[in-house]
Amino acid sequence: MSEMFSYTARPSSVIDQRMIAPAPLFPDMNQNSEGMRKLVQAKQTNDENYWSTMREVFAHDAETLPLQRFKVWMSTLSVPLMSQARHSEYIRLGLDAAQDPVYRDALTETYIGMTEQDHQMVFNMFSDFPTTMNRIQALGHLLFNGYDYEKIRSMKTIVELGGGVGDLCDTVYRLGFTGDYYIYDFPEISKLQEYHLTTAGHENVKFINSTDSLVAGDLVVATWSLTEMPLDLRDVVVDKLQDSKEWIVAYSNKIFGIDNDAWIKETFIPKMKNKTCEINALDFMPWDGGTFYLTVK
């Protein structure tokens, strides 16, 4: 009787192990891979070759790891493009602001670039508020320097030098910004930002990798980016953006052997003609010779 019937086994669904593996995701999903070796060496050496090496790692990761979880790639976490240092000053600013539903919405995690499980295991901070330290710090850069959502909404163009994973850009749009947002970064990092911000539905973001495409903005934001560039590139970038109205620059004093405090005071500030420049020390970030905000208004 059985020979009268044929049976077709239902194919079992194939599960992408990369989507369910516990975070962090190492290069090639292997803690002992060549990519991981490069990453560790770059971090330990931390010299002028750091970013050339990390660009290779990110390029390889983009080909072999899921973009849906790029925020828990080991490369992303190690730079870090996703901050996990829980500074109470930023947390205070964020929680105070979150009493306003506009800020609370901007701080709420969207789970783009991570799974809900990733958030719970790696980034979760509160039992009743799904946010991340990265989002709190992004908003903190604005609030610490006097940029509330009304001021952000009044702007038409914002330029960010080194956009991280795109959280500051996402925050700005969720605060009600409707203008054009330019992110200048390495192509390998732009790919991550574009995935994040396009998925989030932000249509007016320009991802640029050439100084030729830089435009003056109502606000330029450069958090640990302008002051990590080679000196000759800094000059080109600042000259291109010299007509920008306002700046927020966060920097640490010593990076790759360069005295950033001297560069800020002797090179950058003299180029800001007819503007008020103010430097504030961030005492809760004492590493690398001290950390500072410079505002130009």
Residue spans of the language-model regions?
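Conserved alpha-helix/loop element of class I SAM-dependent methyltransferases that forms part
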Residues: 135-155
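A short SAM/SAH-binding and catalytic strip from SAM-dependent methyltransferases
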Residues: 220-232
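A short, conserved alpha-helix within the catalytic core of class I
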Residues: 229-241
